[in-house]
Amino acid sequence: MEKRIVCLAGDGVGPEVMESAKEVLHMVERLYGHHFHLQDEHFGGVAIDLTGQPLPQRTLAACLASDAVLLGAVGGPRWDGAKERPEKGLLALRKGLGVFANVRPVTVESETAHLSPLKKADEIDFVVVRELTGGIYFSYPKERTDEVATDTLTYHRHEIERIVSYAFQLASKRKKKVTSIDKANVLESSKLWRTVTEEVALRYPDVELEHILVDAAAMELIRNPGRFDVIVTENLFGDILSDEASVLAGSLGMLPSASHAEKGPSLYEPIHGSAPDIAGKNKANPIAMMRSVAMMLGQSFGLTREGCAIEEAISAVLKSGKCTEDIGGTETTTSFTKAVMQEMEEQALVGRGR
């Protein structure tokens, strides 16, 4: 298989974890006979420094022409006073690609469960599906005076139906349960959200649906996260709750994410930030980036076996006691990546010997 992947290393630790992603992809090429054209493009703060824009037109054009996009990290205090903020480029990239579904799997390795703030963290295994294109971030009018500020929250039926349908399709391949999170006791947009969700649910009789108000959901994520399978919610609620959920893993360096469009390339990235305090020190945890690669292989390219091989290698290395500083170990970014690649190679040899 041949695929073109645009690599947006970005800022902070982004270039370091992107290098890990590339090395893992090269190992997949060698072990399974695929070929990936990896195209580097400027994005975020580094793009501002070079072009004055966080998302240069050349970068967006390259992304649109690709089969998938990998993003390292974006932003940092260096650009706090800049006219253009790096994070603005991420919103523009999502809009340009037309991605509407942000997918964050939240799982906890038994080897790192002790790092979670919760007891029985190894029972956590759910996915947060967040709507990305509507809601309060993208609705108008928006206005502010010295005395009054106004934001508008708008959702169209087709936006709700599209994201909820995606969540049900995902749940039908997992534990067959969807939890829809809204504020239907107060917000008109949430009342429509709930109505459309119930209509979609009729098409999936084998999938259980439950509704939870967002304030109760925030509590349940901490009190009983094992109850969840697929969570689906609107943009603002999803932004907040997915960050809350990510803390359950004990380190932001562990979890990947994907953003999908109806047509065209998807965007894959670790959920962690640019971590400027450790940038360039070979300390960044590359697991989330490597898992983003695994998601890309499975979800965009249909290479489920190859994606699983990466996941299994990561788990095996963690079981051996090797891990980076953020999860209690002494491995560097490069040494942990090397260990994962070695494990992938060994597992492939064992598989061929059967």
Swiss-Prot record:
Q: Binding positions for substrate?
A: 94, 104, 130, 215
GO terms, molecular function: 3-isopropylmalate dehydrogenase activity; magnesium ion binding; NAD binding
Amino acids binding NAD(+): 76-87, 273-285
Q: Which GO terms describe its cellular component?
A: cytosol
User: What PROSITE patterns does this protein's entry cite?
Assistant: IDH_IMDH (PS00470)
| Cofactors that this protein relies on | Mg(2+); Mn(2+)
Record keywords: Manganese included?
Answer: yes
What InterPro entries does its record include?
IsoCit/isopropylmalate_DH_CS, IsoPropMal-DH-like_dom, Isopropylmalate_DH
SUPFAM superfamilies, per this entry?
A: Isocitrate/Isopropylmalate dehydrogenase-like
How the cofactor is bound: the record states: Binds 1 Mg(2+) or Mn(2+) ion per subunit.
Q: Which domain of life is it from?
A: Bacteria
Which protein are we looking at?
Answer: 3-isopropylmalate dehydrogenase
